From Swiss-Prot:
Family listed: Belongs to the acyl carrier protein (ACP) family.
Classification via NCBIfam families: acyl_carrier (TIGR00517), PRK00982.1-2 (NF002148), PRK00982.1-3 (NF002149), PRK00982.1-4 (NF002150), PRK00982.1-5 (NF002151)
UniProt keyword list: Cytoplasm, Fatty acid biosynthesis, Fatty acid metabolism, Lipid biosynthesis, Lipid metabolism, Phosphopantetheine, Phosphoprotein
Pfam (any one): PP-binding
Post-translational modification comment from the UniProt entry: 4'-phosphopantetheine is transferred from CoA to a specific serine of apo-ACP by AcpS. This modification is essential for activity because fatty acids are bound in thioester linkage to the sulfhydryl of the prosthetic group.
Name the UniProt record assigns to this protein: Acyl carrier protein
Family matches, as HAMAP family: Acyl_carrier
Boundaries of every Carrier domain copy: 4-79
Pathway: Lipid metabolism; fatty acid biosynthesis
Role noted for this protein: Carrier of the growing fatty acid chain in fatty acid biosynthesis.
GO biological process: lipid A biosynthetic process
GO cellular component entries: cytosol; membrane
Domain of life: Bacteria
Length: 81
């Protein structure tokens, strides 16, 4: 899966889980501040990313994922390694 495909899928998951329009999402968008996620939304988003991409995201790593780009980069790095 290419980085572009991962980005598209991450965007789709955000739209599905958070009820935002795809055009509202930017790489620098912060889940809490820009997209209105609360802590439960964030946990559900991380779980969906784990399920969709077949990766484990430990809590200490999940706490560092605050923007859309950080989520994409994390998944890309996990899928490559």
């Amino acid at each position: 899966m290419s980085a572009a495909e991962i980005k598209d899928k991450v965007y789709d998951i955000i739209v599905s889980k958070m009820g935002v329009n795809k055009d509202q999402i930017k790489p620098e968008s912060k889940f809490a501040d820009d997209l209105g996620a609360d802590s439960l939304d964030t946990v559900e988003l991380i779980m969906e990313l784990e399920n969709e991409f077949g990766v484990q995201i430990p809590d200490e790593d999940a706490e560092k994922i605050g923007t859309v780009q950080q989520a994409i980069d994390y998944i890309v790095n996990k899928k490559v390694s």
